[in-house]
Regions:
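Amphipathic alpha-helical packing segments from all-alpha helical-bundle domains
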Residues: 54-57, 85, 103-130, 137-141, ...
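Short hydrophobic clusters on alpha-helical segments that form packing/core surfaces
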Residues: 1-5, 82
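Short, hydrophobic secondary-structure boundary micro-motifs
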Residues: 13, 93-97, 135, 186-187
Length: 188
């Protein structure tokens, strides 16, 4: 089923008939496990998202093993590892496109331990930098939204900007978000 959702258009996901035919199961069996194809898409997305987060966390922890570093460097290294995963798993991107709200809800529900841990760590990080819990959660949502939407076109088509350019822009944004409170307070 994964190949059906990653090879087609995000605007026209495969039909239930296509899914059950490829999986070699009856429609009734499909409906025992999933309410509809969108629930299946959410499950596939959650699995790939957890794989991405787990891979990025593992590489980040390896990179900083036994070393002290500042929070911005740690988050930027994590984001670099997410970009590496995206670059190596482009087939996953059609599943990601337009699924930011689902991604955020899944992180909040914490159905996957990796997502729950990563989300909790990010909230604590922002709290330590003077943000309220509400502001911390909003910052995470904005980062996830930007990361997923801009990385899809950049990774698949190389436009309007290359993935490396997007990565550097995200790093600057993280550095600003994690700057001292006095440095980031501004009037709009």
């Amino acid at each position: 089923a994964h190949s059906l959702f990653t090879s087609g258009s995000a605007l026209k996901p495969p039909t239930i008939d296509e899914v059950v035919k490829l999986a070699g199961v009856a429609k009734g069996t499909f409906y025992l496990y999933f309410k509809d194809k969108y629930e299946l898409m959410d499950q596939l997305f959650l699995k790939k998202l957890a794989e991405c987060v787990n891979s990025a966390l593992f590489k980040t922890r390896q990179h900083f093993a036994g070393r002290q570093t500042d929070d911005a460097e740690r988050v930027n290294t994590f984001l670099d590892n997410v970009f590496v995963y995206i670059e190596e798993n482009k087939a996953f991107l059609p599943l990601v496109r337009d699924r930011v709200s689902s991604c955020y809800r899944m992180m909040l529900k914490g159905r996957e331990a990796e997502l729950k841990d990563a989300y909790g760590s990010l909230v604590k990080l922002f709290l330590a930098h003077g943000y309220t819990e509400y502001e911390s959660e909003m910052n995470i949502y904005m980062l996830v939204s930007m990361l997923t939407s801009v990385s899809c076109d950049s990774a698949v088509h190389g436009e309007p900007y290359k993935l490396d350019e997007i990565k550097h822009g995200m790093q600057r944004l993280v550095n600003k978000l994690l700057a001292n409170k006095e440095e980031r307070d501004y009037d709009i």
